[in-house]
Each structure stands twice: as C-alpha cells, then as structure tokens.
Amino acid sequence: MKYDTRISGWGECALEFLNEDCNFLIIFNETAPQELADISVLHTVAMLQEEPCVGDTVQICDVSYTITAIGFEALHTLKELGHCCLSFSGSTQALRPGNIELKGPVFTENHLYKADGFKS
C-alpha cells in the first residue's frame, strides 16, 4: 500500500465539485486550515510510502480507479499536506498541476456517506 488513509470528514462546500462541469474532489489532511477545509474532503494524516504512478489503482470508499495522469505538483503536495485534486476525468494528461486524474465509475457524494477510506 503506497498511501493508506481514512476519510474523517468534509467541508460544507466540498461536494459542490462533484458535478458534470468539475467532477473532482479536493483532499487535504485533517490539519488543513479552515478556509481550505471548507472546500475539501479531509482525511487522517498518513505517510506516503511510495509515490503513486500512472497505471496504479486508487481505492476511494470501496470504489476502484486507475491513475491516468499525475500533475507535476500533485505528489509533492500529497506528501507534504495530504493534498491533491482527485479528478474523475480519465484524462491522460493532468488538467491542473495538482491533479491526479482517475478513470473509473462515476463518483458521487453517496460514496462519501459510506466512506471507509482512501487507499493507493
């Protein structure tokens, strides 16, 4: 397991990005400042054991996704802050520097209500 953490909550605006136009989640360690916590899915602090790579499987709330691209800032901020943007676009190029692009089933807020964690 390269990164194993548990969802501990989410901010009141975090789920607004799970729409057809955006289709992403912003994640942060639960130590995020309040202004960032309001727009983020928060998770327990965990050590990045090994960098995730294109082709790896990411499991979010018991739903599996394949990493299709990683932005040039994503691994640094994931390691330092537990932060990145998980984009469900399936794009083979990162749409933003902090994105990890994922391919798989549609992710909805209902998955978060059954949250059991985030694993890669």
Residue ranges and their predicted role:
Residues 1-23:
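N-terminal, charge-rich interaction modules
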Residues 90-120:
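Helix-rich interaction surfaces within compact, conserved domain-sized segments
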Residues 64-73:
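Short beta-strand-centered aromatic/proline hotspots
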Residues 23-41, 85-99:
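Short, basic/aromatic beta-hairpin or loop at an interaction surface
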Residues 61-62, 117:
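Conserved "cap/hinge" positions at secondary-structure junctions
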Residues 74-85:
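Short, solvent-exposed secondary-structure boundary/capping segments
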Residues 50-53, 58-59, 110-112:
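Short, well-ordered loop/turn sites that connect or cap secondary structure elements
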